[in-house]
From Swiss-Prot:
Family: Belongs to the glycosyltransferase 4 family. MraY subfamily.
Provenance organism: Clostridium botulinum (strain Alaska E43 / Type E3)
Name of the protein in its database record: Phospho-N-acetylmuramoyl-pentapeptide-transferase
CDD domains recorded: GT_MraY
Residue ranges of the TM segments: 13-33, 59-79, 85-105, 121-141, 143-163, 179-199, 201-221, 243-263, 303-323
Functional description taken from the UniProt entry: Catalyzes the initial step of the lipid cycle reactions in the biosynthesis of the cell wall peptidoglycan: transfers peptidoglycan precursor phospho-MurNAc-pentapeptide from UDP-MurNAc-pentapeptide onto the lipid carrier undecaprenyl phosphate, yielding undecaprenyl-pyrophosphoryl-MurNAc-pentapeptide, known as lipid I.
Length: 324
């Protein structure tokens, strides 16, 4: 543990954290008025919480802020194109591009219909297969089983399972981004967990990237926390999902997403349960889904929701360390 703490206090690590944070803090006041001027505002669904309707027109695509911040940070640090940290950056960019296209089309059409489902699925499949192949040839097909102190070799099933894993993780983070600051706050904690594990297991570059992205998200939170001046949009949420999935894949810890990313999992399950129940019985289990909207309908404020979900994520990450 002492060596891990030393790594966290390493000048490169501290520089990555501070640069990511500083770049986001600087870019926020540049992007917010620019997106306002371009009329790149969020269209709010009328079937969502009524309290959210007043947020219509809030600048979206704010994911570009931490997207650019972490990219510049990694380039300044000077990693080679084939380094592990850069592979995570490529995944951030790849899935961020899908989100960017989705956001742009929503803005152009002035509704919440961006990329068609099949278009998004094709792009997700292309990038997921590429990253699954990278994992198959460079990382190995074994993954760590939580609490078991052992590994499971997926063999020929590795690539198809990893493709499903990417689709699930990116969409789960996307669903979590439904109230001001929620996805950002939860993901900062998850990234910190993976950074510590990265340093502890010798994946230094993955640790540095995780810290840089956590710093960039903290800077972004200055503008994304309630009341949000900007939303990350699909540009940000899909990028974060792709990056987290790749970080866990390199560390051979995809199964740990279920634990430390428990909030992502619950958000996704709430939607699946709600849709299944309504289609089969005509009744809803929750007042609204994803589940953060259910709690909003129960009277919880956005600040309370973010605080409680963040504390839960912190506890889940502690459990994640126990599961190693």
């Amino acid at each position: 543990m002492g060596d891990t703490i030393k790594e966290l206090l390493n000048p490169t690590v501290l520089s990555a954290l501070l640069m990511g944070f500083a770049f986001s803090m600087v870019l926020g006041p540049i992007f917010i008025p620019m997106l306002h001027k371009l009329k790149f505002g969020q269209n709010i669904r009328k079937d969502g919480p009524q309290s959210h309707l007043k947020k219509s027109g809030t600048p979206t695509m704010g994911g570009l802020i931490f997207f650019i911040s972490v990219t510049v940070t990694m380039l300044i640090i000077g990693y080679k194109p084939t380094d592990e940290g850069m592979v995570v950056l490529y995944s951030l960019i790849a899935f961020g591009i899908i989100g960017f296209l989705d956001d742009i089309l929503k803005i152009i059409h002035r509704d919440n219909l961006g990329l068609r489902a099949y278009q998004k699925m094709i792009l997700l499949l292309l990038f997921s297969i590429a990253l699954a192949y990278y994992g198959y040839t460079n990382i190995g097909t074994d993954i760590i089983i939580p609490f078991m102190n052992s590994k499971l070799n997926l063999g020929i099933f590795y690539i198809p399972l990893v493709v499903v894993y990417y689709a699930a993780t990116t969409n789960a983070v996307n669903l979590t981004d439904g109230i001001d600051g929620l996805a950002s706050s939860v993901t900062v904690i998850v990234l910190t967990f993976f950074a510590i594990v990265g340093f502890k297991t010798g994946h230094y570059q993955v640790g540095v990237f995780s810290i840089a992205l956590a710093g960039a998200l903290l800077g972004f939170l200055r503008y994304n926390a309630f009341p949000a001046k900007i939303f990350m949009g699909d540009t940000g949420s899909l990028a974060l999902g792709g990056a987290i999935a790749t970080i866990a894949l390199i560390l051979k810890m995809p199964l740990f997403i279920i634990i430390v990313g428990g909030i992502y999992v619950v958000e996704t399950l709430s939607v699946i349960i709600q849709v299944t129940s309504f289609k089969t019985t005509g009744k809803r289990v929750f007042k609204m889904a994803p589940i953060h909207h259910h709690f909003e309908q129960c009277g919880w404020s956005e600040v309370k929701l973010v605080t409680v979900f963040s504390i839960i994520t912190l506890i889940l990450c502690i459990i994640g360390f126990i599961a190693l």
